[in-house]
């Protein structure tokens, strides 16, 4: 009985990821003042690849640099190219410093950027913003 469970568990773990073959998709670039998250999805919103600045080994204040966003975009883009991505629509959200460099990095990989949208949410006088920094 115990062997049957372990054999079933082993076959479940050994199941290989199915590579999707998608020609075009959407690059969701979420930039904050602390980190940059890049998710590449198909048109339906199913994630094909993703990467973050912190996941690429950048820690602390270096996560929020344009270079860290560029490295994360290259990692996500290479995985997306393996899935067959040829062109992307970029949706950029947030005020961070890695906005432009992430899109440039995807373009330099040979992925055609067809459209760039700014989908940063703007409050209609909602929550009170954080107080100004005094240095």
From Swiss-Prot:
Gene Ontology BP terms: translation
GO molecular function term, any single one: structural constituent of ribosome
A GO CC term attached to the entry: ribosome
Domain of life: Bacteria
UniProt cross-references to InterPro entries, sorted A to Z: Ribosomal_uS11, Ribosomal_uS11_bac-type, Ribosomal_uS11_CS, Ribosomal_uS11_sf
Keywords: Ribonucleoprotein, Ribosomal protein, RNA-binding, rRNA-binding
NCBIfam families, sorted: PRK05309.1 (NF003698), uS11_bact (TIGR03632)
Reported function: Located on the platform of the 30S subunit, it bridges several disparate RNA helices of the 16S rRNA. Forms part of the Shine-Dalgarno cleft in the 70S ribosome.
PANTHER family, per the entry: 40S RIBOSOMAL PROTEIN S14/30S RIBOSOMAL PROTEIN S11
Listed HAMAP family: Ribosomal_uS11
Quaternary structure and partners: Part of the 30S ribosomal subunit. Interacts with proteins S7 and S18. Binds to IF-3.
Protein family (similarity comment): Belongs to the universal ribosomal protein uS11 family.
Protein name: Small ribosomal subunit protein uS11
Originating species: Polynucleobacter necessarius subsp. necessarius (strain STIR1)
């Amino acid at each position: 009985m115990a062997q049957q469970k372990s054999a079933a568990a082993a076959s479940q773990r050994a199941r290989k990821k199915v590579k999707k073959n998608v020609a075009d998709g959407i690059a969701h670039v979420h930039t904050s003042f602390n980190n940059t998250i890049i998710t590449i999805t198909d048109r339906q919103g199913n994630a094909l690849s993703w990467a973050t600045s912190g996941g690429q080994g950048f820690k602390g204040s270096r996560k929020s640099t344009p270079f860290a966003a560029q490295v994360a975009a290259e990692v996500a883009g290479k995985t997306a190219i393996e899935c067959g991505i040829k062109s992307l629509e970029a949706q950029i959200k947030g005020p961070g410093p890695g906005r432009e460099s992430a899109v440039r990095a995807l373009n330099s990989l040979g992925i055609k950027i067809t459209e760039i949208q700014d989908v940063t949410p703007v409050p209609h006088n909602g929550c009170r913003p954080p107080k100004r920094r005094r240095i």
